[in-house]
Amino acid sequence: SGLIQRFAEPVLHGVLEVESPPIQRMASDILRIAVLQGLSHPMQVVPTLVALETSQDSVLRSRAAHLHRHLYSKHASLLVSRYNECIRASFQFQCSLTQHPRGYQQDAQVHALFQTWYDILGENRSMRLAFLRTLTRLLSMSAECTDADVDFGLFVADNLALLEYRVVEEPLLVIHELKVLHAVMGGHMTSLIERKH
């Protein structure tokens, strides 16, 4: 237990190491053992698992989804507070794969990178709605946004556009949150323009 906790950060870093697949696979084996044995803290591990769920490697993707489901079944209420961190970790992981990451993957069909995560939230309505709220609110940008901010916004928007929503309430919630965001950002932009002129 102490050994796993001591080397948790290097293992989590190794799991996301796309330049060296053997290191990535070995680290994912260690992570799997740590999670299933209860030797790692779920709050520390889940952002990495969510990032791996967006991997192009189907073995890593399914392994991460299995571990995420395992942790979600035991610690669902704890994991809600990590939505923002998980989304950003996934984006950073995608940035390590490509210069301008998108929020979808195209196999036989196009699907949102966060579809697996959304499916894990499953029947828990409040968790799904909290997830969608967090995702939508991350589209907020300041007037001084960078190219990386725009890429992140596009990554989030792709996921929102391509998620397979379960009930009508969910896209309606996204639309409502976007309206609120538009009102706030529109007012902010108007005041910036007025100050400059």
Can you describe what each PLM-predicted range is?
Residues L36-Q37, P47, A65-H197:
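Long internal repeat-built scaffold domains in very large eukaryotic proteins
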Residues Q5-H75, V80, G153-A157:
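Internal alpha-helical scaffold/solenoid segments in large eukaryotic proteins
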